Amino acid sequence: MGNTIVLFEVTVKNGRMDDYLKMSGSLKESLANAEGFIRAERFSSLATEGKLLSMSVWENEECVSKWRNFAVHRMAQKHGRMNDFADYKITVVTPVRSYTMIDRAAAPADSNAYLEV
């Protein structure tokens, strides 16, 4: 399970969402081809207008570090800080446990007992 997950919470400045989405979209191909990249998803906050959460999953933290320092990503970081971001927070985590509705091997025993699985 040793993947590394990066959570990028960003609040985009008023009137800058289209620019931010265009800029982040321009990274898609580079991201897809980055060493160790597994997948990414973006979610929009229901509570805070203009706030997004991007979650990317990587093979390990070394791959995250390489992406962080990739030239086009660095340029996008600077552009975002200077133009698009009102605020942001980055959290890097490794999973404690992961299970699904079907694969319950790592699920807590009390949950499996309650669900009778």
Could you tell me what each predicted segment is?
Residues 1-52, 61-69, 84-117:
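Short S/T/G/P-rich N-terminal loop/turn motif that feeds into the first structured element of a domain
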Residues 81:
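Glycine-rich, flexible loop/turn motifs
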